[in-house]
Amino acid sequence: MKKISLPKIGIRPVIDGRRMGVRESLEEQTMNMAKATAALLTEKLRHACGAAVECVISDTCIAGMAEAAACEEKFSSQNVGLTITVTPCWCYGSETIDMDPTRPKAIWGFNGTERPGAVYLAAALAAHSQKGIPAFSIYGHDVQDADDTSIPADVEEKLLRFARAGLAVASMKGKSYLSLGGVSMGIAGSIVDHNFFESWLGMKVQAVDMTELRRRIDQKIYDEAELEMALTWADKNFRYGEDENNKQYQRNAEQSRAVLRESLLMAMCIRDMMQGNSKLADIGRVEESLGYNAIAAGFQGQRHWTDQYPNGDTAEAILNSSFDWNGVREPFVVATENDSLNGVAMLMGHQLTGTAQVFADVRTYWSPEAIERVTGHKLDGLAEHGIIHLINSGSAALDGSCKQRDSEGNPTMKPHWEISQQEADACLAATEWCPAIHEYFRGGGYSSRFLTEGGVPFTMTRVNIIKGLGPVLQIAEGWSVELPKDVHDILNKRTNSTWPTTWFAPRLTGKGPFTDVYSVMANWGANHGVLTIGHVGADFITLASMLRIPVCMHNVEETKVYRPSAWAAHGMDIEGQDYRACQNYGPLYKR
């Protein structure tokens, strides 16, 4: 099939239409603003897949209805998914604005004294508010000279934040969530809500029974040569941890090999179901070769699959990572236990950063007193107020070991286009594969085990659905924490020492859900969460406002909160504004 084109950013230079001197004097300055904006975005941003971001600039400056319509025709033909309107001067507000109701939009009004760019910005935003089409305001803090073509740092920050979030919105639209299986062990996030995906994200849900995965494996609907390559890769790179099962449940070498083979096959087949694979057409499986156009997926696993077949831990861990037997590549988004709401948080994080996402149980709050009682160790540094144990049976991306390095040599998780093969190998070397515990997984499997390096900034997120309200987003910025090995071992063995662990310390504010670490744990809305590298909560907030998903919990500095200008008309408290505005406007793709 022809690859679906990536969304582009549309740049709309608007201008005062009065001829005989006014428009003529502004043409060059206005178009240069558009070109400078496009240059910034193409230099600083990439799509989550790693491709360069493209900007489309209107053929002419826009002074009124006719030129606005011509611009819209061009944008419609080039898959423009978000727009930025720029101007240094007064223009005719409602005559020049972008009226597309679902396309994210921002307006940059140049802060200068010669021409009233700020006046147009205010007039245009008033029109957006009155018409119920919210837009983001960009206005520099300091006055610039008319001939100053630079983009101030505060303007650049807003342009980039808007564009990152807008590209995420546009990239999700029209894609699907592959629900492989049904409800896992009564977990509410795996009660997949089609209306949520359709109305808030512009996505479809493809529901497929797990027997389809069984069929593909049993009928060899996969690339057999690739399977051999995957097995060779695993033989070279997998280190195996101890088998903690009772003797009667331990598998011999032949049985273990069969479990590994099926685990790798599951990864291949889930990937093929998500994105398709032309190799399947070569073996006469044309229908299966197309895939389901899935930008994210979830696998139920427990218990209807895992009671008799290998669990999804190996497949999910490999798919969620930025590398496999084919080398470094874009990570997939696959939610364990088909927790679609955690899958959406993973999808948001990946679209905003291009990085792999760490899926985890929000398992245990350890107070400083409890840790000292159990281990004799007194917490200090980032961990002094207590920590949260983030751990799951193995679906976390191996990037979460943080064996990659930033430009200053610090541990991190990088966008896949920056990861070297050596860094991928280091993540693999830091991971052990432990036989699944029989009591949980009767069909066997392998769980990845690694320990996240400490001192790494992370943002933990989660989407929940509240009856009568709709979706809400939770955000907690913080850091991974490194404990002394003996302390980690004692605490880890109290849970499950064969699973990957991140010790997480959220940043506290002393208020509300961030009064203390216990309050963060107590206010978390579900049993799962996602770790995204960096303190990127502000980007999540902007993205959520575009989708009309209110944020019910965050610890982002107020100065970094960036939402459409119309939110300010919904009260004086910015979080109350968010709830009222999201309720007022309703989901982005209203149904």
Curated annotation (Swiss-Prot):
Q: Which CDD domains match?
A: L-fucose_isomerase
Q: Which GO terms describe its cellular component?
A: cytoplasm
Cofactor(s) for this UniProt protein = Mn(2+)
Q: Please give the pathway this protein is involved in.
A: Carbohydrate degradation; L-fucose degradation; L-lactaldehyde and glycerone phosphate from L-fucose: step 1/3
GO MF = arabinose isomerase activity; L-fucose isomerase activity; manganese ion binding
According to the record's subunit comment, the protein's assembly and interactions are: Homohexamer.
Question: Short name of one Pfam family for this protein?
Answer: Fucose_iso_N2
The function of this protein is:
Converts the aldose L-fucose into the corresponding ketose L-fuculose.
Keyword 4Fe-4S assigned to the entry: answer is no
Q: What are the UniProt keywords, alphabetically? A: Carbohydrate metabolism, Cytoplasm, Fucose metabolism, Isomerase, Manganese, Metal-binding
What is this protein's record name?
Answer: L-fucose isomerase
Q: Where in the cell is it found?
A: Cytoplasm
Q: Which organism is it from?
A: Escherichia coli (strain 55989 / EAEC)
Q: What top-level class of enzyme does the UniProt entry assign?
A: isomerase
Which biological processes are named by the entry's GO terms?
Answer: D-arabinose catabolic process; L-fucose catabolic process
Q: What is its main location?
A: cytoplasm
InterPro entries attached here?
Fuc/Ara_isomerase_C (IPR004216), Fuc_iso_dom3_sf (IPR038393), Fuc_isomerase_C (IPR015888), Fucose_iso_dom1_sf (IPR038391), Fucose_iso_N1 (IPR012888), Fucose_isomerase (IPR005763), Fucose_isomerase_dom2_sf (IPR038392), Fucose_isomerase_N/cen_sf (IPR009015)
Question: Which family is this protein grouped under?
Answer: Belongs to the L-fucose isomerase family.
Residue positions annotated to bind Mn(2+) are E337, D361, H528
Catalysed reaction equations from the record: L-fucose = L-fuculose
* Highest taxon listed in the record's lineage: Bacteria
